[in-house]
Amino acid sequence: MATDAKRLKTEGSDPLQSFLQWCEGVGLKLNNKVYISKEGTVAEYGMLAKEDIDEGELLFTIPRMALLHQGTTKVLAVLEEGKASLENTSGWVPLLLALMYEYTSPQSHWRPYLSLWSDFTALDHPMFWSKDERDRLLKGTGIPEAVDTDLTNIQKEYKDIVLPFITLHPDLWDPERHTLDLYRSLVAFVMAYSFQEPLDEEDEDEKDPNPPMMVPIADMLNHVSNHNANLEYTPECLKMVSVRSIRKGEEVFNTYGQMANWQLLHMYGLXEPYQSNSNDTADIPMSNVYKAAVQVTRSEAEQRLLVEKWSLLCEMEMVGDKGVFIFGKSGSLTDTEMYTTLKILCMSVEEFEDFRENEGWEEADDDEEKMLQALSNEGLPSLPPVWRCLVHAAARFTLDSYGEDMLKDKVLLEDKDGYAKLSSRQRRALQVRYGQKTILHQLLELTKP
């Protein structure tokens, strides 16, 4: 570990040079074995190993005063004074207001850091794609619907909370400069680059999550599910530590958590190549399971019984209008909800009446381990035939909702020349689509009659 912050030389990268000099000034210390670059990385800036690095080595430390958040910004006092008017469900507004001020202030303490993103054009979240492009490339993935919700919420938040607040403080913000477009870009910036300090275990059930914060240097590391470094939090500083050995020339990767490809694209604008993401998932809308159950009803009496069963599942909070059952590469990740739903939907009239009258959802025999095993890849083929039928039909309905045929996507992925001609957006969308379809297709195979 360097005793002083290491000034890294990068030819032709003035913003990066200024930033690294700023890092020295604020006491951010980099290990001599690593350097920041745009070359040789999977996306934009990244960190590379200059020498072999052992597991457990300290890669850099960041003093807490170098973090940018509502408690360190120059407009702290104003944000504290208006705290009540800035409350919202996301908890992001104070940080976003701080960023709006610091990003546009020539005297900002964080200017060398924020200058690395001169105009946010590098951010290519689906929220910046046209609606037609989202709907065409990402149909069935769940991303278009998530983005529509985001954009509606961002506009409402800016109009109802941010604009009235900045109008009250014309010495700090200007609606002509601090526009909705800038606010939207900063939301994407926070989505892609911010960190949220985890709560202590004893506080998890009692406290709200910590607000997001910007962490210079740490936010330049790219993500893969099989990461080789991890950020640790201490009262004095934040530390990036290698969690396995890193060879000279390899990129240093942090992790954003267990993120499926659709989440990575939605929140970070990136996607891991097909098969690389061990955390990839596919969602089956709960409404598709209901649709599958409707298909097998043979009389009005059975249809009425199905409505009663679904109503009870809603009361039990096992299903909801916009809910989804999540499947990963090894089986269900929402096993309690999926198992309980299948069990109740497949009950006879007598079984259902007994279950409802005796509050059967409290039965001890359906333990978590049993449900987990039943809905794993190993357990799915052994489910009762009627259960498998519902899962199979729901998976088929979900696969049919995608715009592109699975075989066409497969051919495109395997055609190196054709794949190379795709735009970055087309490639990322393809990775997301095909990863989800593969999981759903596997589910079809495991539940076929």
From Swiss-Prot:
InterPro entries: N-lys_methylase_SETD6, Rubisco_LSMT_subst-bd, Rubisco_LSMT_subst-bd_sf, SET_dom, SET_dom_sf, SETD3_SETD6_MTase, SETD6_SET. Gene3D superfamilies: Rubisco LSMT, substrate-binding domain, set domain protein methyltransferase, domain 1. SUPFAM superfamilies: RuBisCo LSMT C-terminal, substrate-binding domain, SET domain. One of its GO terms (biological process) is negative regulation of NF-kappaB transcription factor activity. Residues 32-257 form the SET domain. Keywords: Methyltransferase, Nucleus, S-adenosyl-L-methionine, Transferase. It is found in: Nucleus. GO terms for cellular component: nucleus. GO terms for molecular function: protein-lysine N-methyltransferase activity. Its EC number is 2.1.1.-. Its main location: nucleus. It is an enzyme of class 2 (transferase). The keyword Cell inner membrane does not apply. It holds the Pfam family SET. PANTHER family: N-LYSINE METHYLTRANSFERASE SETD6, UNCHARACTERIZED PUTATIVE METHYLTRANSFERASE. Belongs to the class V-like SAM-binding methyltransferase superfamily. Histone-lysine methyltransferase family. SETD6 subfamily. Protein-lysine N-methyltransferase. This is N-lysine methyltransferase setd6. The lineage of its organism: Eukaryota, Metazoa, Chordata, Craniata, Vertebrata. The gene is setd6.
